[in-house]
C-alpha cells in the first residue's frame, strides 16, 4: 500500500485561488505538513466564469484554457516544493481535482467536466498525478459529488456525537456524520458564489471583506422568499449543483422583480440565503450536536453568527478548532483520495452520491521512472 508524502491541489467553484497542500498519508493517519494558496490570473478566472455561464468557446480556446490551467496547477505545486526544499522524488503523487467548468449529473447523458491538463502537471513537476476523480461515480449512476464526505468521515466522525461538517466554498455542501447511520452528504446550494459574484460586479471586489457590505444592508424578505422558491432547495438528496446553475444570471433573473434595490441590501439578502438554505438542510437531516465549518465561508463572521442563531442547541464551530485547517480541507481530501486510488481502495460513498456501488476513483498519469 502506497504511503508517504502526497500533494493535494484544489481550485474550487469560488475561484479564489489554487490551494496546494502537502501531507503524509498512510492507512492510519493524515498529517498536514504545509500549504499555500496560489493566485489565479484574472484572465483565467474570467474565462472559467464565462464557460460556467454558458458562453461558447471554440475548441482551440477550450484546449488553450485546459493547457493554461494545467500549467498553473504545476506552477503552484513547484512553488510549494521550492518553499519546502523538496524534490519530485520526495512525493508519491499529486491528487488534482481540476477546475470544474460544467456539472450536469442528471439527464439522458449525465456528465461533469474538470479541466487543467494533468499531463502538463506531470511534465512540469516530474510527479505522478491522480485526477479526473468524479466521472467514474457518474458512470455508476451517481452524482459525482460531493466526494469529500468520505474524507470527513475518516477524520472527523465520532462514535456517539451527532456531527455534521459544512464546507462553504462557492457551493455549500454538508456531510452527515451520524452514529449508527450511513454517511450522508449533498450540496445545499450557493455558499459564497452569489455573494462574491454580486460584489465583484457592483464594487470590483473579489469578496465582501469582513461582511462589510452585508452588515451595512438589510435583508429584502420578498427577494429572499423569491430565491428560496427555486426547486433545487426542495429537491431530495442525493443532489449536487454548481456555478452552471447558481450563477450571476440566476441572480439577475430574481432581481428583475426588484428594480432599484440598494446593492448592500442585496448583499445582505444573499448572505441570508446561504445561511437559511444551510440551516434548513441541517434541521431536515435531523439536526446535530456539532456543526464544523470549513472553506472560505468559515471566515465570514456574519454567516457564522447567522448559522448559530438559526441552529439553537447546535455548537457551530470550525474544523480548525479540531485541528484541521478549514482553508485546506478540500485540497487535503484530494491528496487522500489520490492515496486511496493508488492503494486500490474505493473513494466514493454510494450513500452520498447515489452511485450503484463503491469504486476506485480517478485516472493515474504516471511520471517517468
UniProtKB/Swiss-Prot annotation:
GO terms, biological process: 1,6-anhydro-N-acetyl-beta-muramic acid catabolic process; amino sugar metabolic process; peptidoglycan turnover
Domain of life: Bacteria
EC number(s) stated in the UniProt entry for this protein: 2.7.1.170
Keyword tags: ATP-binding, Carbohydrate metabolism, Kinase, Nucleotide-binding, Transferase
Pathway given in the UniProt record: Amino-sugar metabolism; 1,6-anhydro-N-acetylmuramate degradation; Cell wall biogenesis; peptidoglycan recycling
A Pfam family: AnmK
Residues binding ATP, per UniProt: 12-19
Molecular-function annotations in GO: ATP binding; kinase activity; phosphotransferase activity, alcohol group as acceptor
ATP-binding among keywords: yes
Catalytic reaction equation(s): 1,6-anhydro-N-acetyl-beta-muramate + ATP + H2O = N-acetyl-D-muramate 6-phosphate + ADP + H(+)
Signal peptide boundaries: none
Keyword Oxidoreductase: no
InterPro entries: Anhydro_N_Ac-Mur_kinase (IPR005338), ATPase_NBD (IPR043129)
The family this protein is said to belong to: Belongs to the anhydro-N-acetylmuramic acid kinase family.
Function as written in the Swiss-Prot or TrEMBL entry: Catalyzes the specific phosphorylation of 1,6-anhydro-N-acetylmuramic acid (anhMurNAc) with the simultaneous cleavage of the 1,6-anhydro ring, generating MurNAc-6-P. Is required for the utilization of anhMurNAc either imported from the medium or derived from its own cell wall murein, and thus plays a role in cell wall recycling.
Protein name: Anhydro-N-acetylmuramic acid kinase
Organism expressing this protein natively: Shigella boydii serotype 4 (strain Sb227)
Lineage: Bacteria, Pseudomonadati, Pseudomonadota, Gammaproteobacteria, Enterobacterales
Gene it is expressed from: anmK
Amino acid at each position: 500500500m502506497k504511503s508517504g508524502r502526497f500533494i493535494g491541489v484544489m481550485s474550487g467553484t469560488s475561484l479564489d485561488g489554487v490551494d496546494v497542500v502537502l501531507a503524509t498519508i498512510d492507512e492510519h493517519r493524515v498529517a498536514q505538513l504545509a500549504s499555500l494558496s496560489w493566485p489565479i490570473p484574472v484572465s483565467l478566472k474570467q474565462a472559467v466564469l464565462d464557460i460556467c455561464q454558458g458562453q461558447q468557446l471554440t475548441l482551440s480556446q477550450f484546449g488553450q484554457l485546459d493547457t493554461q490551467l494545467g500549467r498553473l496547477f504545476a506552477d503552484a505545486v513547484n512553488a510549494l516544493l521550492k518553499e519546502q526544499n523538496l524534490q519530485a522524488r520526495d512525493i508519491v503523487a499529486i491528487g488534482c481535482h481540476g477546475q470544474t467548468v460544467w456539472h450536469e449529473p442528471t439527464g439522458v447523458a449525465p456528465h461533469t467536466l474538470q479541466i487543467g491538463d494533468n499531463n502538463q502537471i506531470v511534465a512540469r513537476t516530474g510527479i505522478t498525478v491522480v485526477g479526473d476523480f468524479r466521472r467514474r461515480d457518474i458512470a455508476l449512476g451517481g452524482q459525482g459529488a460531493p466526494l469529500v464526505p468520505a474524507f470527513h468521515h475518516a477524520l472527523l466522525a465520532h462514535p456517539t456525537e451527532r456531527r455534521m461538517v459544512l464546507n462553504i466554498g462557492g457551493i455549500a455542501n454538508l456531510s452527515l456524520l451520524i452514529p449508527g447511520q450511513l454517511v450522508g452528504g449533498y450540496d445545499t446550494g450557493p455558499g459564497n458564489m452569489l455573494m462574491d459574484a454580486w460584489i465583484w460586479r457592483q464594487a470590483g471586489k473579489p469578496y465582501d471583506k469582513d461582511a462589510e457590505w452585508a452588515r451595512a444592508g438589510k435583508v429584502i424578505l420578498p427577494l429572499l422568499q423569491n430565491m428560496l422558491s427555486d426547486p433545487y432547495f426542495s429537491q431530495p438528496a442525493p443532489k449536487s449543483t454548481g456555478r452552471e446553475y447558481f450563477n450571476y444570471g440566476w441572480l439577475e433573473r430574481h432581481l428583475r422583480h426588484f428594480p432599484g434595490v440598494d446593492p448592500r441590501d442585496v448583499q445582505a439578502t444573499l448572505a441570508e440565503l446561504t445561511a437559511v438554505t444551510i440551516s434548513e438542510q441541517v434541521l431536515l437531516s435531523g439536526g446535530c450536536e456539532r456543526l464544523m465549518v470549513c472553506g472560505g465561508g468559515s471566515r465570514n463572521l456574519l454567516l457564522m453568527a447567522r448559522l448559530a442563531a438559526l441552529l439553537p442547541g447546535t455548537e457551530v464551530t470550525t474544523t480548525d478548532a479540531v485541528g484541521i485547517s478549514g482553508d485546506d480541507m478540500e485540497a487535503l481530501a484530494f491528496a487522500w483520495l489520490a492515496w486511496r486510488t493508488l492503494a486500490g481502495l474505493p473513494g466514493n460513498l454510494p450513500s452520498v452520491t447515489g452511485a450503484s456501488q463503491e469504486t476506485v476513483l480517478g485516472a493515474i498519469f504516471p511520471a517517468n521512472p
